[in-house]
A protein has these predicted regions:
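Basic nucleic-acid-binding interfaces
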Residues: 3-6, 12-74, 83-119
Length: 119
């Protein structure tokens, strides 16, 4: 599997964000040894950005809850908020999967607020 450049990530505004190179490569080493937990694998998949359309909706919701977000449901909209984070995350199902653009929004938040260190 080809990995993206671990030094820089680009958010939707085109600004470069440095993210934790050590954490990313630690995940790569754990994956090679096959000793990653469920949420570490999910974060690895989200950060690589190669399977945004294959992330299960329920797995993404559970990951956000594990990261400390509070969920509020209004119809088909699942809204996640966390103290200290300005943005709110709004997720909807696309069948049994999360919508790819919403997975990208979650990835940008994980990188921006360094939430990957919480797992």
């Amino acid at each position: 599997m080809e990995l993206p450049d671990a030094d820089l990530k680009t958010d939707t505004a085109g600004k470069r964000q440095h993210f934790q190179k050590d954490f990313f490569y630690r995940l790569v080493r754990l994956k090679k040894r096959k000793i990653m937990g469920k949420y570490q694998k999910l974060i690895f998949t989200i950060l690589t950005g190669q399977a945004d359309n294959k992330i299960k909706f329920i797995d993404l919701c559970n990951l956000l809850k594990k990261l400390g977000f509070e969920e509020r449901v209004r119809g088909s909209h699942h809204i996640f908020r966390k103290e200290g984070i300005i943005e709110k995350i709004n997720l909807q199902k696309d069948g049994s999967h999360a919508k790819p653009y919403q997975v990208k929004q979650v990835r940008n938040l994980i990188i921006k607020y360094k939430l990957m260190e919480k797992i």
